[in-house]
Amino acid sequence: FIVALVTGILLLIWYSPSVNGAYDSVLAMQQSPYLVELLRSLHRYSSDVCILFIILHAFQMLGARKFGGARWVAWLSGMLLLGLVWMDGWTGYWLVWDERARQIALGTANFLDVLPFFPEPLLRSFLTNDGLNSLFFFIVFFIHMLIPMGVVAFLWIHIMRLNAARFFTSVRMGLALLGVLIITSLMFPATLAAPADMTVVPQDLQIDWLFMMPLWFTERLSGSVLWVALFFTTVALWGIPWWLTKGNPEPAVVNEASCNGCTQCVQDCPFNAIDMIDLEEPRSGITEFARVNLDKCVGCGVCVGSCDSSSINQSTIPVMDVRKFVSQLEEDVRHVAFICAESAGERFPIDENGSCEALPGYRVVPVSCVGWVHMLTIERALRRGAEGVLVAGCGVDPACRSGADYTGSRLAGDREPWLRVDHVDPS
């Protein structure tokens, strides 16, 4: 997105936003010094990569089922981002005003003519070359310039509920992507079709399927059918957080009377779902307490593993009950395993006694996220006779973002609350 934005701004130096001058200005770019042609190719390919990554990210979230509960805001804003980026690419191809732009203009007019906003059908403006409206062309140019502002706004909405959200990839990955884009642009420069002629139907037109796939529909369906298809597609995509969610985990609850206001849960919550509230009557030096925002909480339980005072709980898996459960080991069961319910715990059947055929000799506790596991729970199991404790979390795509990393840091003594090595044998 950044590459497309920067190159697009630079291309304004050479581009003429008028129906009569657009094609000639783009043709001049293609025939001008090497740098300008490279900028145009970078603009085109970076746009393709941008929408491709958005689509892949959407499928990743869909496959990982990261769309239910409080995540619905991220899902809907993500769908809007996808639509905005596609629209920016659609209008961008229009601004070239070649044969591909001709088909885009006719398809758009076919789609918009259903609306009762226009005094006369838009298609009439594209019957002849003389009927082309320069003002309408400039409006398309203005929309193309305005959409990136909407992308930035919805991107903020998309990630505003994430704690320590990352806007950019690593420097190494960013440079690698830029290098690939530059090499691709040099080897396969962006093409330019023949100039748009409203009286001639282009033959064997090569299109960019990532942005121009709707042309297949606009050339075959009426505007009314297109609107109906768009409506049901939008409802289907936007309804995924409610239609495909099996059930949302119970949110965390804070016992405000015992909260000591340490703020560790606020620092650890992956989804910014905890706020510190001022006490009306401070007690023993404590001036604030934690409160879970139920509209943001996804029920990951990472805050439970952060709370030294055991003031945060989930009704489905109370901390004290689990500590008692792992303390009462049988003679043939001398190990304890905390398994993420979103990964291994979902695949292995575990009975109410904590027995699992895949882990003989272990008392298995499925948890919403391994970040739920407080170090005191591990210490208690080891002090009460457990010969070892296994903590198995998610793989490369954690269901609850940083929960597994936090647990690893706590076990290593790099993050509070850490495992007290003087109380147990960490080996």
Question: Residue locations for each model-derived region?
Answer:
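Membrane-embedded alpha-helical bundles of multi-pass integral membrane proteins
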Residues: 1-13, 24-43, 56-251, 266
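Conserved oxyanion/phosphate-binding beta-strand-loop segments in alpha/beta enzyme cores
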Residues: 2-22, 338-353
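Individual alpha-helical transmembrane segments in multi-pass integral membrane proteins
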Residues: 44-49
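Iron-sulfur-associated redox domains of electron-transfer enzymes in respiratory
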Residues: 79, 93, 104-107, 318-427
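Short Cys/His-rich Zn2+-coordinating modules
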Residues: 240-253, 278-280, 284-290
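Membrane-interfacial segments at transmembrane helix termini in multi-pass membrane proteins
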Residues: 247-257, 313-325
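Membrane-cytosol interface motif
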Residues: 251-270
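Iron-sulfur cluster-binding cysteine motifs and their immediate structural context
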Residues: 264-323
